[in-house]
């Protein structure tokens, strides 16, 4: 996935969930939009290098968007979680996700379920069961272990209940954890943050819901990040 042209700055603070103040190299302070409403644990500390994009839209109050954080250990993380679906769609179209490569039709944002939900992707193929794919962003990493969630997620819990119901109806159901961070080589649920999500995921696995986590990789040109891609499936080390 190609990233928009990016410029770097130093993070001063994030506030009101959607805003952040950053300092440019010339000392100017700029307020930028933050699309990530989560806790952003470990990827939004004062002093971090942030990479932001610019929009020419006349309707936006804040034309700049926080896209990436360059961590003090050198790792990169995409904090714009809107990118996770774009990234996953590209991987599906390119048949990079082997467990799902047999599907030919990819339908985004389809209404489904009993709790007024939308599935990120509904996959269809001749002679194949419909496959419901829910995408989650992996931005939290500790000791090279990618984790989700970074805050209690009642929405994520709802999605697991919906996937369990779809599986019980004879469909395929998948939770896909997309690596927006390039510093992990295995994945688990952050049960210490959201034990209910961990409990529901274990229940989902027992019911036959599939779990896949893919590592992320950034490409650079002239030391600027230019692209993000999913490279390979990493081990899920949670309980099964």
From Swiss-Prot:
Pfam families from the UniProt entry: SfsA, SfsA_N
InterPro entries recorded: Ig-like_dom, SfsA, SfsA_C, SfsA_N
Cited Gene3D superfamilies: 2.40.50.580, 3.40.1350.60
Domain of life of the organism encoding this protein: Bacteria
UniProt GO molecular function: DNA binding
Coiled-coil ranges from the UniProt annotation: none
Leader sequence segment: none
Family of this protein: Belongs to the SfsA family.
HAMAP family: SfsA
UniProt name for this protein: Sugar fermentation stimulation protein homolog
Organism: Pasteurella multocida (strain Pm70)
